[in-house]
């Protein structure tokens, strides 16, 4: 992980070129000082990186489901610390759209997983009520519903923190302003203000428009922005001896009243206007809206434009109490699942089959980047078929005007979130039908087109015969075994990062002797600081990664000893690393050791030798050029 982090930091132009870094479910999202210093093409070819996307003012590196681990490694390697998670105070670069997407993604990205979790929990509770497994009066329901509803009820406080960080202000000051919006005294004043004989509320004689700000989104975002501006001015003007407490004091005294008097009513009016406008457009042509959103959603995601729609969805929940956009996106997700399953069925390469299968599984839960970038998009036609299938499914859902009643990532869980308080109705069944059509059409279309293209290839003229150059070990520069032990097929390795082949083709060994010896003549290209992995580049350009054990990076070098340094010249059979097998096993780690060809894409194929047991120095892999 550390080696991948080093390559990523180098690929984005070095630590000094990083302004800020955050991550979502599958991507590292960099804000760079100078994007021209980034080496996108180099990063795209780096094992462990699925894709690189430059969009929305961000340099995005698509990693996959283990992005959180890579984020921590990059943070450590680059020495970013808190800077990695904070936004710059001002971002004046890029066009208006890029700046908008950058701000919105920074505010909502940290909350997406939690919002999805609370949405799923609400859907499960709705399902339980529908089948009468519980009642609204039961303690179990009340406690779990409180957990599912708390995030949105106190949204102004939570968004105060993320918006405060994004705008470069003190996030805790913005949180307090958000807390004022949903304080019990304010909510009580709002309820009393609904009565016919209620007296109005004023601030220093200025009348206050009483509104319910629970679950609101836009007011606190504007307030956090204003607060950050005032805070910077005050920090510049006030003496350092008093600004630590006078700055937040003055911000609260100024911004809180301004929020209640001006920002809150104005932004609430804007929220209602946006919701009414969206509802009018949607109700005018719901089926067409479904076709557009279902067909183009994944394209929006590729370019990072989907972040501009997240506030719209959340605003719909705040103003309308439901959202009609998320149901339209669910078929787009299901279609990517179907296309990936089609590739899984048709693919003959065992490792690529594993990649397609695991990508389809993660897509079911709304994480489509592995399926899009690792499976469907590189093959082109599965991605196109998935977009068309998503449009078909979403057209049906749009026609039925299906709604969801809680926020969540478009996924298999969306079906539960479409259940209204009155129970399962036609709109729920429409979402099921739309999802099934999307996944079914994408699967069938991908399989059919695969067989059609496979039949046409021989008719295009027989290709010229080319005898592949096979490098067999050890005489002709092939790969010898670096260990003595039992051969394990790569697809049986417990870590899917290795098993999927994303880091390169190869084989694994369960060692019986605690030594790693050089499999080739060459030089040491890399040696991890924790000594659990080493990279060797052979004299004829084959790059080999030997990773001793699974998750052994957590040992932090304990039980490992290195006998070489980076840059050393080595011969076949030279001792590279020693390790204590009993101690590592006693610590609870799997010693299965992947031996990978990192630059597998440079060769026609990498073939393991068929043997169950092997000794160090015996033939292990053949490279076909």
From Swiss-Prot:
List GO terms (cellular component aspect). Answer: plasma membrane
Q: Which residues act catalytically here?
A: 24 (phosphocysteine intermediate), 547 (tele-phosphohistidine intermediate)
Transmembrane region(s): 100-120, 141-161, 167-187, 203-223, 245-265, 285-305, 325-345, 354-374, 381-401, 404-424, 432-452
Do you know which PROSITE patterns this protein is assigned to?
Answer: PTS_EIIA_TYPE_1, PTS_EIIA_TYPE_1_HIS, PTS_EIIB_TYPE_1, PTS_EIIB_TYPE_1_CYS, PTS_EIIC_TYPE_1
A GO MF label: protein-phosphocysteine-trehalose phosphotransferase system transporter activity
Per UniProt, residues of the PTS EIIA type-1 domain are 495-599
PTS EIIB type-1 domain location is: 1-84
Entry EC number(s): 2.7.1.-
> An example of a Gene Ontology BP annotation on this entry?
phosphoenolpyruvate-dependent sugar phosphotransferase system
Q: Please report the stretch or stretches of sequence annotated as the PTS EIIC type-1 domain.
A: 102-465
**InterPro entries for the chain:** Dup_hybrid_motif (IPR011055), Glu_permease_IIB (IPR036878), PTrfase_EIIB_Cys (IPR018113), PTS_EIIA_1_perm (IPR001127), PTS_EIIC (IPR003352), PTS_EIIC_1 (IPR013013), PTS_IIABC_b_glu (IPR011297), PTS_IIB_1 (IPR001996)
Q: Which residues are on the Periplasmic side of the membrane?
A: 1-99, 162-166, 224-244, 306-324, 375-380, 425-431
The membrane topology term of the UniProt record is:
Multi-pass membrane protein
Q: What class of enzyme is it?
A: transferase
Location comes to: Cell inner membrane
Going by the UniProt record, its keywords in alphabetical order are: Cell inner membrane, Cell membrane, Kinase, Membrane, Phosphotransferase system, Sugar transport, Transferase, Transmembrane, Transmembrane helix, Transport
Domain comment quoted from the record: The EIIB domain is phosphorylated by phospho-EIIA on a cysteinyl or histidyl residue, depending on the transported sugar. Then, it transfers the phosphoryl group to the sugar substrate concomitantly with the sugar uptake processed by the EIIC domain.
Q: What does it do? A: The phosphoenolpyruvate-dependent sugar phosphotransferase system (sugar PTS), a major carbohydrate active -transport system, catalyzes the phosphorylation of incoming sugar substrates concomitantly with their translocation across the cell membrane. This system is involved in beta-glucoside transport. Acts both as a kinase and as a phosphatase on BglG.
Q: What is this protein called?
A: PTS system beta-glucoside-specific EIIBCA component
Identify the coding gene: bglF
């Amino acid at each position: 992980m550390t080696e991948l982090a080093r390559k990523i930091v180098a690929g984005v132009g070095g630590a000094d070129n990083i302004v800020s870094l955050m991550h979502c479910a599958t991507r590292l999202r960099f804000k760079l000082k100078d994007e021209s210093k980034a080496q996108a093409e180099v990063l795209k070819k780096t094992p462990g990186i699925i894709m690189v996307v430059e969009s929305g003012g961000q340099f995005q590196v698509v990693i996959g489901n283990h992005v959180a681990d890579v984020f921590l490694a990059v943070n450590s390697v680059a020495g970013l610390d808190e800077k990695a998670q904070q936004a710059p105070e001002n971002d004046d670069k890029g066009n208006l759209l890029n700046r908008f997407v950058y701000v919105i993604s920074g505010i909502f990205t940290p909350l997406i997983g939690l919002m999805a979790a609370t949405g799923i929990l609400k859907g499960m509770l709705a399902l339980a009520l529908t089948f009468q497994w519980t009642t609204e009066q039961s303690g179990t329901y009340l406690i779990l519903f409180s957990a599912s509803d708390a995030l949105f009820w106190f949204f102004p406080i939570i968004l105060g923190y993320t918006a405060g960080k994004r705008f470069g202000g003190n996030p805790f000051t913005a949180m307090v302003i958000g807390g004022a919006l949903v304080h019990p005294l304010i909510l009580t004043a709002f309820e009393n203000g609904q009565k016919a004989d209620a007296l109005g509320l004023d601030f220093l004689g200025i009348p206050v428009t009483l509104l319910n700000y629970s679950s609101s989104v836009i007011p606190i975002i504007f307030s956090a922005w204003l607060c950050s501006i005032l805070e910077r001015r005050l920090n510049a003007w006030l003496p350092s001896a008093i600004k630590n407490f006078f700055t937040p004091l003055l911000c609260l005294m100024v911004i809180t009243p301004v929020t209640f008097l001006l920002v809150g009513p104005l932004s609430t009016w804007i929220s209602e206007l946006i919701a009414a406008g969206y509802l009018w457009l949607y109700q005018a042509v719901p089926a067409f809206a479904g076709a557009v959103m279902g067909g183009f959603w994944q394209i929006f995601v590729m370019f990072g434009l989907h972040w501009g729609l997240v506030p719209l969805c959340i605003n719909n929940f705040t103003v309308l109490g439901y959202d009609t956009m998320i149901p339209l996106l669910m078929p787009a997700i299901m279609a990517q699942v179907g296309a990936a399953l089609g590739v899984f069925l048709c693919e003959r390469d065992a490792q690529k089959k594993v990649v397609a299968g695991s990508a389809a599984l993660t897509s079911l839960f709304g994480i489509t980047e592995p399926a899009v970038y690792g499976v469907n998009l590189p093959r082109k036609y599965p991605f196109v078929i998935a977009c068309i299938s998503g449009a078909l499914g979403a057209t049906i859902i749009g026609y039925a005007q299906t709604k969801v009643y809680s926020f969540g990532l478009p996924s298999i869980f969306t079906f539960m979130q479409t259940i209204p308080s009155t129970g399962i109705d036609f709109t729920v069944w429409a979402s099921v039908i739309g999802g099934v059509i999307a996944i079914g059409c994408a699967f069938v279309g991908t399989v059919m087109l695969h067989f059609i293209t496979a039949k046409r290839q021989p008719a295009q003229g027989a290709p010229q015969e080319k005898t592949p150059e096979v490098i067999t070990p050890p005489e002709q520069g092939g790969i010898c075994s670096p260990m003595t032990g039992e051969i394990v097929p790569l697809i049986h390795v417990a870590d899917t990062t290795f098993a999927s082949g994303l880091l390169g083709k190869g084989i694994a060994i369960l060692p019986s002797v605690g030594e790693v010896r050089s499999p080739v003549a060459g030089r040491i290209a890399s040696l991890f600081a924790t000594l659990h992995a080493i990279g060797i580049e052979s004299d004829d350009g084959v790059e080999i990664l030997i990773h001793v054990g699974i998750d052994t990076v957590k040992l932090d070098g304990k039980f490992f000893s290195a006998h070489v340094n980076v840059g050393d010249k080595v011969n076949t059979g030279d001792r590279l690393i020693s390790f204590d097998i009993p101690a590592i096993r006693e610590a609870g780690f799997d010693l299965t050791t992947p031996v990978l060809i990192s630059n597998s894409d440079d060769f026609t194929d990498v073939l393991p030798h068929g043997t169950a047991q092997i000794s160090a120095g015996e033939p292990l892999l053949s490279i076909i050029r």
